[in-house]
Structures are given as C-alpha cells and as structure tokens.
Amino acid sequence: MKKFVALLISIVTVLTLAACGKKNNSEIDWTKTSLKSSYTIGAVEGAPTLSLVNVADGGFTYTDNDKNVTTDVTVAADATAVVANLINGTYDMAILPINNAAEIYDNSGKHEFRLATVNVFGVLYMIGKEDIDENMNNLKGEVVYCVGFGGTPGLVLKHLLEKNGISYEVGDNATDKNKVYIYPVAGGPEVIQGLNGGATKFAVLGEPAVTQVSGKTGASVVLDFKKEWQKFHGANSTFTQAGLVVNVNKVNKKYVEALVGHLKGNKAYLYANTDKIPAKLTSMGSTGPISKLTYNETILDRCSSDCKTATSMRANIEAFLAANNVELPGGSFYCL
C-alpha cells in the first residue's frame, strides 16, 4: 500500500509541475518543428512495449533529404517515470494510458503533448482460482487484488462494478458479503504471493503479466474487461487503453506520420515473429518476465496490440474518458 500511495503522489506532483506557467499555445504548427537526428520513445514494461516491437533495435529509420533519423525505444521503471521523462524532455514520445494523456494535455497549458495513435485496445483481465461465470456479482464478499489501482486498471474495475450495481471498498479484509474489496498491489510478485498464500482468489492485471502470473499460481482468466465493457457501452465500442503521445514542440509531423505508418505493421510483425519478441523486448531494456515468455497467438490475442490514428478513434476515446470521469481534452489533442 505504501508503494501505491507513493506512486500516486509522484504522478500528482509531476502533473502539478507541468501545469506551472500555463498559457494557451494550442495552435502549434508542428510541420515546422525541426527534424532531429534521433528520437526516443518511452514505455512502461508490458503491453505498451509490445506495441513498439517492430520499431525497436533499429527497426525504423526515417529519411528526409538524405538525413537519416533513428528511433530509440526504452523501457521505464513505472508509469510515473514515463510521465516525468516525457514532461522533462528525456522522451520525445511515449506510450501512455489514454486518461494520463488527456490529463497531461490539459495540465501542461501549452498543449504540446498530443495523442497521435491508439496502440493498446484492452489488455485487462481478472484471473482467479475459481470461476465466476463471467458475472461480477459472484465477486461479492471477496478481496480482489488490483495492479495499477491508481491508473486505468483501477478506474475500469470501479466503473464496471458500478455499472453492475455492486458496492466496493478499498481494503484487504472482506467484512461485508455484499461488497467487493479492492486491494491495490504494486505488481505480479504480490499477486502471486496473494493467490498462492490464500489471501485472495482474484486479481486484476494486464497481459502479458496475466500469462506469467497464471503459470505460477494455477489461476485462469475469469473475466475479460473488454467484453464486460461492451455489455454496457455496446458491442461495437472499442476499449481505448493506451496510445502514442507526442511532444509536437520537439517532433516533426512528417516523421511521426512515417512512424505511425510503420507501427501499423506492428501487429502483423508480432504474429509472424513470435520467436523474436523476447530479444526485441530485451533490446529496449526490458528485464522483467515479459522478455522471458514464450509468445504464441493466444497471448498476442489477449494483448490487443494495434495502431489506429487518434482522430479515427476520437468517439471511442471520449466515451472511455467520460465513463471514467476524466475531463475531455480539446480538439487539438488529437494530432493525427
């Protein structure tokens, strides 16, 4: 819990600092932004890094008037580090949760951090030691561990419980059989300990961590959050979880357009090169379990990696943000 609170405070601090010196600068012409010799994209380990695999390790070079522009992909320790490094200029771009992207856009005041694409389309699952028949009412009286409670996983879990008319509290002691108790945890190791030790029977986390934790606990997927989301928002609704945020004061538009064109091939690359994924992740700096998994079609299906422009997904993005009580950003937020 202490780690979670510290992480939440860090994110709030970063966003507050970004708001200092607020001014309206939404009419940035990033077609005139100078072209650098290299750009860096940051991402937290997990599905965000998988969405960049075909760019990593020299996978993408942009050429303009005989100038070669390289692209580096690097893994950050946690979501706070990704946000901080984007704001302080260490990263030129980053894969961020959509809700974080909207908050940074509004809080910066300069509106230079804009969404180019959506790359992760729902990787959240509930795993369990027993089945719930895809009915969240069967979680009443249970403790559910949640990785990323202060971010998208927690927002979506609470939203879906509310949509199902289920009361919840934050804590690890289930005293009311009519409530669900959500317990924030830092990551996979705590989930493994909780499931194996009997402290919980259920946990919310994202793929590919789902595969890694399931293999060490005997748990299985009992609820697909993407499907549960569609029950309340329509069968054609799209779960827009994370996307590419660009600092348009630092990155040239033509370069980003070329990069996005390349990223649209990432999904096909993943399925055609499952054996190369671990090495690609390692080249980004990944040292966690996801760089050691044996990837297959089932895992990739659950990772929901793709690349669609932000403008084409605007209606879905705004529905996702509104459902999670995040203030909708202005039109210039959608830069491609």
Range-by-range predicted roles:
Residues 25-183, 201, 207, 222:
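Short, glycine-/small- and polar/acidic-enriched structural segments
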Residues 21-23:
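Bacterial signal peptide processing site
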Residues 98-100, 179, 183-278:
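Pocket-lining segment of extracytoplasmic ligand-binding domains
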Residues 2-10:
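Sec-dependent signal peptide recognition
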Residues 317-336:
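Conserved C-terminal helix/tail region of periplasmic/extracytoplasmic solute-binding proteins
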Residues 249-323:
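Secondary-structure end/capping motifs
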Residues 57, 87-88, 106-109, 131, ...:
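Sec-exported extracytoplasmic/periplasmic mature domains
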Residues 16-19:
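C-terminal motif of bacterial Sec signal peptides marking the signal peptidase cleavage site
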